[in-house]
Structure formats: C-alpha cells, structure tokens
Amino acid sequence: MAKQNKPAIRFKGFTDAWEQRKLGEVVERITRKNENLESTLPLTISAQYGLINQNEFFDKRIASKDVSGYFLVRNGEFAYNKSTSSDAPWGAIKRLDRYESGVLSTLYIVFKISDERKTSSDYIVTYYNTDLWHKGIQAIAAEGARNHGLLNVAPADFFETNLTMPKDYAEQQQIGSFFQQLDHLITLHQRKYDKLQVLKKAMLEKMFPKNGSSVPEIRFKGFTDAWEQRKVGEVSESYSGGTPSVGVKEYYGGQIPFIRSAEINSEITELFLTEEGLKNSSARLVAVGDILYALYGATSGEVGRARLKGAINQAILAIKPHTDYDSEYLAQWLRKSKHSIIETYLQGGQGNLSGTIVKELSVDFPSLKEQKAIGGFFRQLDNLITLHQRELEKLQNIKKSMLEKMFV
C-alpha cells in the first residue's frame, strides 16, 4: 500500500493516491519581529506539551528581558525547535494553540499555512507528530554539527524537506480532526490521572500523623483515640530470599514465578524457578497480598503487594503483619515514607537498604478498625489511579498505531 502512496487505514470514500510536496510549497516562513512589543510572553517548545510559556516550563525566565528582537508568533502559527532530546531526536515542530501570541528566539524556524483552504492546519499538526519527517531533517542537518544538542538546520533547507499528504482537503481535515479529538481524550485522562495523584499525595500527608503529633490532621468519623508508635519488626514477620545459581539450567524454567524488585507490583514475571531451584537456594516463597519491599538499586524503597504466589530474591523483603495490623495500611505508610527513608539511610541515593533498617522503622498505628478504613481508602484511590493510567496507556497506544497506519 505504501508503495502506491496510500495509507493502510483511510476514512471511507477516499481512494486517491497521496502526493509528495515540499514543505515550502504549502507553508510560508515568518520572520516577523516583536518590535512593537505586541507580546512579552516568552515561549519554548516541548515535545510533550507543544508551544508553552517558558517561565512555567523551566520554572524561571531564560529569555532576555528585551524581547523586541524575538520572533512574534500568533495563534495557529508553527515553529520548529532544532534542540534535540530523548523525546525529540530531530527536534520538534508544534503549533501555537495555548495563547493568542508569544515570542520565540530567532534560533527557531517559524512558519504558517500558505492557504488554509487547500491545506489543513490540523493535518500538518498531526503529520509532525509522526516520525516520517525525521529522515528529511537527518539528510539536511550538517554532519556532526550539533552545538549543545542544537541541530544545524538552515531555514532554506528546512523548507525543502518533503511531506506526504492527501490531495483532497476533506481527507486532510478528517485525519486532523480525528487526531485532535484523540488528543483531547488523552489530555482529559491525563488531567484526571494527575489530579488523583495530587489528591493521593495530599491525603497521605493529612491522614497520617506528622512528626511530633499523635493524631493525623484528617480522620474518618468516629475515631478519636491517640495512635501508638511501633517498629515494623514488632508488628510483623519479615524475610528476604535469594537467587539460585544462574549457571545451573535445572534451576530455571519451572512453574514457580521468580519475583525480582522491578516486578513487585506485577502480575507476571520474566523468570520461573523449578522446585529444585527453590530447594537448592535461599529463594523464599511469598503469598498473594504479602508486602514486598525493594531493598537494592534503582528500586530501593519501592513498595508492592504480591499479585501472585512466587519466590523472591535477596533484593526484596517480604513483610507479613501480625493479625492486629493491616497490610494495606502498613504498605501505604511505607510508600508515603519512601523519600524520608531514602534520604536518611542512603547517602546521595547510593547503596542499599536492608531488612534490619526496615524492621527498625517506627510507624504510627491507630486501632485495627481505623487502619482498615485508611488502608481501604487508599486502595480504592490506587485502583482509580490505575484505571485512569490504563485508559491513558490504551489511548496513547491507539494514537501511536493510528499514526503509523494512517500516513505514508
């Protein structure tokens, strides 16, 4: 299909082959300076957020105080940021949608659609969300000429790069509109997800006692008793596992999930042990619901609840609270305290935690009934966060797939 210049997926009623155009044939460069100070809003381009207020994005002002020599960009106009990043290996091309106008450094290449009756602005936005244009930039960027991540791309060469597009404006518009709606849905779910994360962080601060206090700021109705402080080791049994010798193939490939620290919240594992591997090593079994605490490396301080019955290695501490203590409550406290634990016990984030350190941690506990109420509240909140995260990932995967199949 691609050889015929037709995409794999199209809207009904469109059959013509797409055409290849030079960017400069459908857009025109803008070199308008901000001489009359029409705008004092400094902009930057983020691969994720598009054209955005520079002060908010960097949390400080990067632009000069005098912006009269900057390009003036108006709503609906485009800009190419030649700076590269992991998200934008060949820079980013975005349209100004958030503000009526703003100013950009003259290092950017600014342009607008020449004739919006023939070229859909939304289509151009979407096209530059694909990676189809990267090859053209790669061809014109001067070899080795990267100055602090800034590509050496001349404006004249930039406008000579190719893009493919439907001849029919109606098809362009439908494609652009489809992705604009998809982006709107993604933004809605992202906002809900972000709000829930902020809510959880705030409630974790308010529903557990602060240092020096014996009660929290917010409590469920009906609970008035003071809380008591106990060490993790006093209220639970805990143990770490081990790793069977990797050179013995008979120890691996069995039916026992082998949970490693990056998998403490996962329902699947990459490795499986045999009964022989379990027997001939320090690996220990855990049950569904056990608290799993990561001790080593990049995941130090991460907390999970076992999603499956399996074995753990030495990088994980399994914690099983006694019957008077709620697992979910303790897991939430450990999550809330991750930053302070890392700061206290790991110098500069380096090194490992240990079972001894975790068992000595002091935790504030209310009655079991109140623990269960708090743990249940945060479990529901976590489920809601996970739901929005999955929806977000699903929509992002749909977008990625459609960007690949609806363009040539």
Question: Where is each model-derived feature located?
Answer:
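Charged, low-complexity intrinsically disordered regulatory segments in eukaryotic signaling
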Residues: 127-147, 331-348
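A short beta-sheet element
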Residues: 67-135, 154, 260-262, 270-335
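DNA target-recognition patches
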Residues: 27, 33-63, 103-104, 233-236, ...
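Non-catalytic DNA-recognition/assembly elements of restriction-modification systems
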Residues: 10-34, 219-242, 267
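IQ-motif-like calmodulin-binding regions
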Residues: 24-27, 118, 162, 287
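A structural connector/turn signal
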Residues: 62, 68, 148, 280-281, ...
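Amphipathic alpha-helical segments with low aromatic content
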Residues: 1-19, 168-228, 369-408
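A short glycine-rich beta-alpha junction/loop motif
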Residues: 3-7, 102-107, 142-171, 310-317, ...
